[in-house]
Amino acid sequence: MDDVNLIVGLGNPGDKNAETRHNVGFLVAEAVAERLRNPTVGKAFHGRWIDGRFAGRAVSVLVPMTFMNRSGDAVAAAVRAGRCEPRRMLVVYDCLDLPFGRIRMRQQGGSGGHRGLQSIIDAVGMSEVPRLRVGIGRPQDAETVDYVLSPWNAEEREGLSVVIDAAAEAALTAVRNGVAVEDRQDLEVGLALARRTQRRAQLVVVLLPI
C-alpha cells in the first residue's frame, strides 16, 4: 500500500464553471492545499501546482486547467517529469452514483463513465489509480450533462462545506496512510450532514464488501 503524495482535483476552468457540481474536485483540491504547511503555488503541467508539507511529508496538489475530458494531459505531463507515480496519486472527482453527502475512496478500478478519470487512465496506461469520489447524486428531472454543469441547489449549499472538509480530510488521511483497501473491500465514508444546525458533521468510516 503506497502512501499518496499528489492530490489531483478534477473540474473545468473558468468562472462560469466554478460553482457547478462537476467542479467539486477543484474545491476539494483547494481545501487540501489550504491545509498544507509552507505551500508554494505556481503553474505547471497544464494547471495549478501547489507544493507543501503535511504530517512531515512532501505532498503536491494539481488542479488541471485542461478541461475535464483532457485531465490526462496534465497528469501525464507530471508523470513524465517524474513528479508523481500513478499509484501514489489520488484523483478527486464528482460521482453521480453516490448521493450528495457521501464520499468513497478506492485503490483502483474502471472510470465508471467519468470522462476525466478515463482520460487519466488512458494517459497513464493503467487503472491502478487511487481515486476519491464525491457524491453529487443523480438528477430526477434533468439531463445528466445539464445537471453536472449546473450550480449547486440551496439544500446542497447548506451541506457543501461539510462535504468538502470531509473529503479533504479523507485525502490527507491517504497521504498519511495510503489508500487502505484490502482484498475486495471498499472504503466508504458516510457523512451525517449538519443541516439546519451549526454543529460539525461526524464522519462514519465503514468497510463494505464490493
Feature annotation, model-predicted:
Residues 2-108, 117-133, 139-143, 158-165, ...:
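Nucleotide and nucleotide-moiety/phosphate-recognizing core
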Residues 104-110, 148-153:
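Short glycine-enriched, charge-decorated loop/helix-capping segments at active-site entrances
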Residues 186-191, 199, 203, 210:
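Alpha-helix boundary/capping motif
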Residues 107, 196-201:
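Residues in and immediately flanking transmembrane alpha helices
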Residues 78, 206-207:
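Surface-exposed flexible segments
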Residues 181, 192-197:
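Intrinsically disordered, low-complexity regions enriched in serine, threonine, proline
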